């Protein structure tokens, strides 16, 4: 009996030990396993990124040429000018406002002014063959005659002045020519005064045709390059005026030399009226240069 009892006890202990060493499978509820974690249906971005994305989208739309924004954009309201005003007046207003905006550091206003001016320039190019669009709004002279380039790059360029300016130039030429015709003993004084008057007239004409440029300021707050531009205008004005006088003087001298070369004697009328002829011919050439060229 003893051996049998010992055997049964050992078998019971072995069965208990084997059950104790078994891994219990975790009981996972089917309901819990099918439950999905709660998550929002949209992605939330910080407010700064949202505003930045809106700005990028608007900039891309503007760069792509949004037709609705271009249709609503009025360049005349941006520049604060009247559509019937001349283009030279519009250009001066644009240059003044652009300079003020850049000086104050307002980049948004400067960009808006440049966009308005570019749109008006494009309209000018489209209407350059018409001459006048409506009212007294005329195509700018440098756009209307843009393809009429001179043979010499630094030579005079065709630029017809307004009727009022042409009358002023004609009056100046007539007055100084009449002065030397009435008073023969003044020598070349009328020519000297007339030359300085036409230097000023041509200088102002060149200034009105100068395209507005973005000013560059140095460390002291002064605009750099302004003196250089004024110097170029003054040098060109002096060159045009004194070049015309030199051409008239050479023409007179060459004419007299040609008469002598052909074996004829110089008439006394030409010989005694040298100052009058040179001054009158110079006045005519200066009138043509100041009225039709720049």
UniProtKB/Swiss-Prot annotation:
GO terms for biological process: fatty acid metabolic process. Residues 74-152 are annotated as: J-like domain. Probably involved in the regulation of the fatty acid metabolic process in chloroplasts, especially chloroplastic galactolipids monogalactosyldiacylglycerol (MGDG) and digalactosyldiacylglycerol (DGDG). Residues 183-233, 294 are chloroplast intermembrane. One of its GO terms (cellular component) is chloroplast. The lineage of its organism: Eukaryota, Viridiplantae, Streptophyta, Embryophyta, Tracheophyta. It is a multi-pass membrane protein. This is Protein CHLOROPLAST J-LIKE DOMAIN 1, chloroplastic. Residues 59-164, 257-275 are stromal. Keywords: Chloroplast, Membrane, Plastid, Plastid inner membrane, Transit peptide, Transmembrane, Transmembrane helix.
């Amino acid at each position: 009996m003893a051996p049998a009892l010992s055997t049964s006890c050992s078998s019971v202990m072995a069965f208990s030990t084997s059950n104790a060493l078994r891994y219990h499978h975790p009981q996972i509820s089917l309901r819990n396993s099918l439950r999905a974690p709660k998550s929002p249906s949209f992605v939330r971005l910080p407010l700064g990124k949202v505003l930045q994305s809106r700005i990028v989208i608007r900039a891309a739309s503007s760069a792509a040429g949004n037709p609705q924004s271009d249709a609503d954009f009025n360049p005349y309201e941006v520049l604060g000018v009247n559509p019937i005003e001349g283009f030279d007046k519009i250009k001066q207003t644009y240059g003044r406002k652009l300079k003020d905006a850049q000086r104050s550091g307002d980049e948004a206003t400067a960009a808006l002014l440049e966009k308005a001016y570019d749109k008006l320039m494009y309209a000018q190019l489209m209407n350059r063959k018409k001459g006048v669009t409506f009212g007294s709004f005329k195509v700018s002279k440098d756009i209307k005659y843009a393809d009429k380039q001179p043979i010499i790059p630094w030579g005079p360029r065709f630029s017809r002045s307004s009727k009022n300016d042409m009358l002023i130039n004609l009056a100046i030429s007539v007055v100084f020519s009449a002065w030397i015709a009435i008073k023969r003993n003044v020598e070349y004084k009328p020519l000297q005064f007339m030359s300085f008057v036409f230097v000023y007239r041509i200088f102002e004409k060149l200034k009105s045709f100068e395209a507005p440029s973005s000013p560059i300021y140095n460390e002291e707050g002064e605009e750099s390059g302004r003196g250089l531009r004024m110097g170029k205008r003054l040098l060109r004005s002096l060159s045009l005026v004194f070049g015309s006088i030199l051409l008239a003087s050479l023409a007179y001298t060459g004419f007299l030399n040609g008469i002598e070369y052909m074996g004829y004697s110089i008439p006394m009328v030409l010989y005694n009226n040298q100052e009058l002829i040179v001054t009158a011919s110079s006045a005519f050439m200066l009138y043509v240069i100041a009225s039709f060229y720049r």
